[in-house]
Amino acid sequence: MTHLVIVVYNRYDNLKHWLECWSQCDQTDAQLVVIHNTDKEDWQYQHLCEVYNVTYIQRPNVGYDIGAFQDVCRGRLNFPDWQRLLWVTDDTFPMSKTFIKEFNDQMEPGTGVACMCVSNHVKRHIRTTGFMIDRTTAEKLTFCADPVTSKEDCYQFEHRSRRDTFLEQVERMGLKVKQVA
């Protein structure tokens, strides 16, 4: 099963739009999980997820989206048992009703990550606004800080590290990174 994770901070309308989109998509073998980075109880996000029958996880607002990803990779959240994640930020929306299948189709043997965009800006890297990864690959990833706490920690993971960016780590594992067309 694929777990689609939407990481949200304070954009309630984005989450609402996401859930409306999700209700129209092919959800075969997929479960949606919302991770809410916040420092306060915010019942409206949780209630919205309940209305759509979506798993809701609240965590401290530390480390942005990559901090939340690190917490899932390290088993620090009450997250459902998972084998494959499709990780997206709340400002990235599906453009196809079959987007889960399109990502899953790229995850053939020898592929570590399927992503929306491999960017050459700054240096070649995986844009972390939308990517799919399997648990085995995710558990091998390293981060420049544990826990990830700052925007700079996130940038180091994504594209600033000299040799340990997300993409470089996956490729050193002997795995491919594929862009979903």
Residue ranges of model-derived segments:
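A short, amphipathic alpha-helix embedded in the catalytic core of nucleotide-handling enzymes
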Residues: 22, 72, 99-107, 170
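Short beta-strand-to-loop acidic/aromatic patch adjacent to the donor-nucleotide binding site
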Residues: 82-93
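A conserved hydrophobic helix/loop-capping motif in glycosyltransferases and polysaccharide synthases
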Residues: 2-12
